[in-house]
Regions:
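Pocket-edge structural micro-motifs
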Residues: 19, 53, 138-139
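Nucleotide-sugar donor-binding patch of glycosyltransferase catalytic domains
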Residues: 106-147
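A short acidic, often aromatic-flanked loop/helix-cap motif at beta-alpha or helix-coil junctions
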Residues: 4-6, 82-88, 140-147
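Mid-sequence helix-capping/hinge segment at a functional interface
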Residues: 1-26, 30
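Donor-binding and catalytic core of enzymes assembling or modifying cell-surface/extracellular glycoconjugates
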Residues: 32-121
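Short, charged/polar "capping" segments at the starts of alpha-helices
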Residues: 25-26, 55-63, 124-127, 146
Length: 147
């Protein structure tokens, strides 16, 4: 059972991607998130992708702005200044969530939203998000493997 209530709406068709973490050492390559966005857009015709960013994600936001995906009609780049506004937007539209080991992944998982989380420099056995729909991936050499 999700800690913050099961707020997942499987009818939503928006993939949320949070490619930052506040620490470059924890971030999987931005190309991984671009690939996840393209796969979702190609597979789900009426879908959209939101790339979300926090105050510590300026360098990753720059990569997103430079990406050809930023001009795609079904892709939005969003920044959030408060956790409350982020949570409300997430609950309103997220079908699933993809990100690094970060606070936003923990929040999504505790809301019951299916969450794929990538670990690079921290231990997922200690820091894995809690929730019924969490998949953990290790990104330790450019090749991803699921735990």
């Amino acid at each position: 059972q999700p800690w913050l209530g099961d707020r997942w709406n499987p009818g939503n068709e928006t993939r949320w991607i949070h490619p930052g973490s506040g620490s470059p050492e924890k971030n999987a390559p931005f190309a991984l998130f671009e690939r996840r966005a393209r796969e979702w857009l190609d597979r789900t015709p009426n879908s959209s992708v939101v790339f979300s960013f926090g105050e510590a994600d300026e360098s990753v936001l720059s990569l997103a702005r430079a990406s050809e995906l930023s001009a795609h009609s079904r892709v939005r780049l969003k920044t959030f200044e408060t956790l409350g506004s982020f949570k409300n937007a997430l609950v309103e539209s997220a079908s699933n969530f993809v990100g690094n080991d970060s606070g936003p992944c923990h929040l999504a998982s505790m809301l019951g939203i299916p969450t794929d989380v990538f670990f690079r420099s921290t231990n997922p056995m200690v820091w894995k998000p809690l929730g019924p729909r969490v998949r953990v991936y290790l990104d330790d050499s450019g090749a991803n493997r699921i735990l």
